[in-house]
């Protein structure tokens, strides 16, 4: 049942790609009275990736942060270096995800029960897609969340 994704890698400036992804959502966030802050702290974050798929993955994370903001979005998108690795992070201060749901969010078609948030559209494919794309590029995805406090999703790539 698993369709193979076509991956066409080229050298990409990840800071620039993440900046472009964030720009796609700037107007939406501003119109909602929120903030979308970008911090690019990773130097020389050049990587061989499929730019279309990786851009879609980052856009998906930002889109989720907006959808589950529970009001005015307050989002931080960043790149960072740590020992031996680069990170791409998307942090929100929204409704958060319960411990139980956190175990399932990367499964295909799983959608977090959102209580009274009936306006959240989607098919439950987003984080499953993000995880697949990141893993196809040799990276990993980590999610940390606290109910009613917000969610942080980090993509990590080991330095090449």
Where are these regions (language model features)?
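Conserved micro-motifs of the catalytic ATP-binding
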Residues: 2-7, 46-49
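Short beta-strand/loop element within the Bergerat-fold HATPase_c
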Residues: 72-84
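Conserved glycine-rich
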Residues: 34, 138-139
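Short conserved segment of the HATPase_c
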Residues: 97-109
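Short alpha-helical Gxxx[C/S/T] motif in the catalytic ATP-binding
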Residues: 126, 130
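Conserved catalytic submotifs in the C-terminal HATPase_c
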Residues: 8-13, 30, 35-45
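Short helix-loop "hinge" at the ATP-lid/N-box region of the Bergerat-fold HATPase_c
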Residues: 65-66
């Amino acid at each position: 049942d698993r369709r193979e994704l076509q991956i066409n890698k080229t050298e990409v400036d990840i800071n620039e790609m993440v900046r472009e992804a964030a720009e796609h959502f700037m107007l939406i966030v501003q119109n909602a009275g929120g903030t979308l802050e970008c911090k690019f702290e990773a130097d020389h974050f050049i990587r061989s990736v499929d730019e279309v798929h990786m851009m879609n993955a980052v856009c998906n994370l930002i889109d989720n942060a907006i959808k589950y903001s529970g009001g005015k979005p307050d989002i931080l998108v960043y790149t960072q270096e740590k020992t031996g690795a680069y990170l791409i992070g998307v942090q929100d201060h929204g409704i958060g995800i319960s411990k139980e749901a956190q175990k399932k969010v990367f499964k295909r078609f799983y959608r977090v029960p959102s209580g009274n948030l009936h306006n959240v559209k989607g098919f439950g494919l987003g984080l499953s897609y993000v995880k697949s794309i990141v893993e196809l590029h040799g990276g990993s995805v980590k999610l940390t969340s606290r109910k009613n406090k917000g969610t942080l999703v980090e993509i990590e790539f080991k330095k090449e």
